[in-house]
Structure formats: structure tokens, C-alpha cells
Amino acid sequence: MVFKYLAIALSVTLQAAPPAHADTTLVAVAANFAGAADAISAAFHVDTGHIAQITTGSTGKLYAQITEGAPFEVLLAADTKTPEKLVAEGQAVAASRFTYAIGGLTLWSVDADLIGADAKVALLSDKVRFVAIANPDLAPYGVAAQEALTKLGLWDEVQPKIVLGQNIGQVFAMASAGAADAAFVATSALAGPDAPVSGSRLDVPQDLFTPLRQDAVLLNAGKDNAAAVAFLAFLKGDKAHDIIKSFGYDLAE
């Protein structure tokens, strides 16, 4: 009888344990998703035993690194075009591509009194000398900021105040440090456990910019790596979805 219960307990333990052989995968992540990616990576390791090593940057720079031979195995982009382009160029697995998050754009300042209900009043204020956005040539969130300013009829007036960050994470850092009086940041930067508790903000209406649908794709370098395949599968699951939503993103329907 003792042996029977011991066998059952051992069976349950083996079923619950991570795989005996854990692998590592190299994941390139758009800067806006850095915090969420770190949290997902930690949960992924607990669940599977695999390790996802996260490298962040602008989608444009990550694309350039991939095409130049960087050994990334998974890409979490800030747009849909870059994964699509990598598939078309034969550098990624077509069937693996999916939308993992939909981002938002927020005008934010560390000054609690600077930004009210009218973006025009804030951006044209004499108190605002510098407005930070991500470089539109490198970062989809920079494109979104430019689109929003153009649709609001403010691009020409605000352009002399604009300073560029190489990615949306750098833009948030500039605004946080006071190097920019206001900034168009990823809404996710103002959510999650490390979000600032002060400042003023105005969420940019979604109809002012092309939806920030963010696609993931398995790169050719990772198609034979169990950890890379498992990471993308985990990204589609409930645990990852809960983390993604906690950082202020929407999920694709």
C-alpha cells in the first residue's frame, strides 16, 4: 500500500515538474513592451523551466540587427509590418505570426499641472519647450505620435519643439528626467508595477493614429529550438494575457 501511494505521489510530481531539459531562447522585444516582456519571461520560466533572454530596442533597429545576422529566435515587434516583412524575406516562419497586444499612446508630463483635457493648450504652452516622441523612422510609436499631431492640426506648430528618442522607452526616460517637458509615451509605461505615481496625462484617442497592433513571429533561427516555440505558445495563454492586460494593453479579438 505504501508503495502504491509513493508511486502516485511520484507520478503527480513528475507531471507538475518543468521539463528535465530546459533550453534558452533569445527574444527581441520592442521597447514599449519591455516591462511586460520581463514579467512574462519570469512566468514562462516558472511554468516551463525554459529561459527567455530579452533584448529590447526600437522595432526598426531590431529588424536591422536580425537582417544583419543577430541570433534572435523570436521577435515581438511594435507593429505588424516588420514581422510580415521578415516572413516575406524568408527570415521568419509565416504560420507563427500573430498579434499579441494592441498598444495605446499617451501624452504625459512629470508636471502634475501641465496637461489637461486639451492637448493643444498643453503643447502650445510657453511652459513646454521640448516635446519628446520616438523617431518615426525607427519606432511605430513615433509614427503614431506624428499621425496624431498631424490629425490635430498641430504638427507644424509643435515640430520646432520636438526632440526624438531612438525608441519609446528612451522617450519615457527623457520625460521622466525632465529633458522633455512633455512626451508621447506608450500607455503601458504608465501601467504595471513600476509606473510613475505622479504627473499629468492625456490618453490619445485611438482614431487619431493607426492602431498599434503588435505582432510576434518565430524567426528561422528559433524554429528548431523548443524554448522559442514554447515561448510563443505561452504568449498566447491566459497567464501571459493577464500580464499583458495589467500593463495597459488590449488583446486582439
Feature locations, PLM:
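Bacterial N-terminal signal peptides
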Residues: K4-A16
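Exported/periplasmic ABC-transporter solute-binding proteins
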Residues: A22-T56, G60-A70, A77-T80, E84-E89, ...
